[in-house]
Amino acid sequence: MKLNKKIGLIIIDGLGIGKEDNTNAVHLANPPTLNYLINNFPTLQISAAQQNIGLLENQAGNSEIGHLTIGAGRIILNDNANINNYMKSVDYESAVLSNIKNEIVHIVGMYSNGLVHSNYEHIHWIIKQIIKNNNQVVLHLISDGRDDYPYGFAQFIEQINALKKQYNIIVKSLSGRYFAMDRDQRWERTQKAFNAMFVKQDKICEKTFLEVAQSIANSYKSDEFVQPVVFNDDEKYNLKPHQKVILANYRSDRMRQLAHLLKPNKKFHYNNPFLVQDVNLITLVPFPDVDAIALFEKQNLNNTLGDVFNKHQIKEARIAETEKYAHISFFFDGGVNKYYSTKTQYLIPSQKVATYDLCPQMSAHLITKTIIDHYFDHDVFIVNYANPDMVGHSGNMQQTIEAILSVDHEIRKLYDFFEKNNGVLMITGDHGNAEMMLDDQKQVITSHSVNDVWFIITDNKVILNSTQKFSLANIAPTILEYLNIAQPIQMTATSMIKKICE
């Protein structure tokens, strides 16, 4: 199918709409290109959080559910909510867990209230299932500090100690997510976390779990950066062949490297020097390219935007840097890896820096160059610029401003190029972050927000419906109406277009 215009769906990660004050890096950046587009083209403020995209009340959006919702064109029950429904069912009992008897079972999970990658209540549920059959639980904790408050882990100390006593749990290790949940193949980080969890150490931490947890605020930039520590060096609690490891995070992108160190797969080429043979891996939901038994099924999403493009032989390009590559591929396609002859995916390597506030421009210029270089090869471009989110997570206001201005500069180049070459940009965010860097007490916020995001279309022939509240779910139907393509019945959201003038 030949399109009259090329479309660029530009997702600016972590760019929300906030108060116009000094807590808002977007306001302080005063990005000239975005300001120009907002003031001169059809624009709406749309929801990227809470019930409007299938989350809980007051729950912030995130990149996974954001891209999932944009690609699906409908409100989706996310993994957290889906798992909760199973766990709350009186009749539900996991056949997998109930068959584990008289064993040592390792549980790895991020103990957080952020609900982006994990839910600490899921760890509780797994423990309760496991201890029914005379099993010994060895717990490997991951601290957050990124999707939760920077030092939010301290609030869980009493709760974790109560769990230890009630169920005779061994808390063997603690690692910040910076190490345990890397997703950019910085294997030295993942290996360090793995070693603390599963490998015999020459030296263990001289402090107790309680002492370490209480001292994080004085020792680290945030919970995210806690160095992997070992609290128990008893040989019998090191990982052995044929033992079971349960990964209690439901989101796969930041667990796949650790999973690879436990059970190697063809996706990665890194070799674990301390590989334990024949480990039995269990996950909450299926992880792509991971050899594991899943406790719960994921929803099967058909007729996503990518499916529709493929059906109509529309050539699309998916472009993002490493940090967000899974979002414009796996998540955008409904939480599965789909391969179409009509789709080309371009992976732009992320900069190799410790944290992105050290390089706020990231690889944005290479993303833009890739779009322009391949403009005439494709009909539609699905693009993610990661800067406001990845730098916003650092809590560094000035560098987040730089990140926003870097993306704004790239948007200017894209707008000029698309305008000259019969193209239209549709610009949005997947969730808020950079617009809310400080709370009312001027304390740093590193997590996402519940704020709305922009939807901009650079075509003044389009009149958007300003009388209705829309969300990320309405973007796919809007694209299809703009292209005059019938919307599949599975896309239950509606288009935001009121009228297209001749």
UniProtKB/Swiss-Prot annotation:
UniProt binding sites for Mn(2+) 2: 13, 63, 430-431
SS bond partners: none
SUPFAM superfamilies per UniProt: 2,3-Bisphosphoglycerate-independent phosphoglycerate mutase, substrate-binding domain, Alkaline phosphatase-like
InterPro entries: Alkaline_phosphatase_core_sf (IPR017850), BPG-indep_PGM_N (IPR011258), Metalloenzyme (IPR006124), PGAM_B_sf (IPR036646), Pgm_bpd_ind (IPR005995)
Biological process terms in GO annotation: glucose catabolic process; glycolytic process
Top-level taxon: Bacteria
The name this protein goes by in its record: 2,3-bisphosphoglycerate-independent phosphoglycerate mutase
Organism: Ureaplasma parvum serovar 3 (strain ATCC 700970)
Gene: gpmI
